[in-house]
């Protein structure tokens, strides 16, 4: 049986300014950096920041702990 690949449409796009309406970052505003329509998630600048450990490389010879944005569900943001 084949499953339908339904294309989902998000109410926000890249570079839109949005306000977080639910979750730990409620009330914060930021620009949408990337949208994932299939997963119904967006990455918002300065929102949902987590720390990631990075292995040693040429850019980080000793390794590092980097803070970066992670996706949040699109239903938790509104244009604003």
From Swiss-Prot:
Keywords: Ribonucleoprotein, Ribosomal protein, RNA-binding, rRNA-binding
Residue intervals passing through the bilayer: none
GO molecular function: rRNA binding; structural constituent of ribosome
Cellular component aspect of the GO annotation: ribonucleoprotein complex; ribosome
Amino-acid biosynthesis in keyword set: no
Domain of life the protein comes from: Bacteria
UniProt KW Ubl conjugation keyword: no
InterPro entries assigned to the protein according to its UniProt record, in alphabetical order: KOW, Rib_uL2_dom2, Ribosomal_uL24, Ribosomal_uL24_CS, Ribosomal_uL24_KOW, Translation_prot_SH3-like_sf
One Pfam family this sequence matches: ribosomal_L24
GO terms, biological process: translation
Gene3D superfamilies from the UniProt entry: 2.30.30.30
NCBIfam families, A to Z: rplX_bact (TIGR01079)
Family, per entry: Belongs to the universal ribosomal protein uL24 family.
Subunit organization: Part of the 50S ribosomal subunit.
Role, per record: One of two assembly initiator proteins, it binds directly to the 5'-end of the 23S rRNA, where it nucleates assembly of the 50S subunit. One of the proteins that surrounds the polypeptide exit tunnel on the outside of the subunit.
PANTHER family linked: MITOCHONDRIAL RIBOSOMAL PROTEIN L24
HAMAP family found in the cross-reference section: Ribosomal_uL24_B
The name this protein goes by in its record: Large ribosomal subunit protein uL24
Organism for this UniProt entry: Prosthecochloris aestuarii (strain DSM 271 / SK 413)
Gene name of the record: rplX
């Amino acid at each position: 049986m084949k499953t339908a690949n339904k294309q989902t449409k998000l109410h926000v796009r890249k570079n839109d300014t949005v306000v977080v309406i639910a979750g730990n970052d409620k009330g914060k505003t930021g620009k949408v950096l990337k949208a994932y329509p299939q997963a119904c998630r967006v990455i918002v600048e300065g929102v949902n920041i987590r720390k990631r450990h990075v292995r040693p490389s040429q850019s980080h010879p000793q390794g590092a702990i980097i803070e970066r944005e992670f996706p949040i569900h699109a239903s938790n943001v509104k244009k604003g």
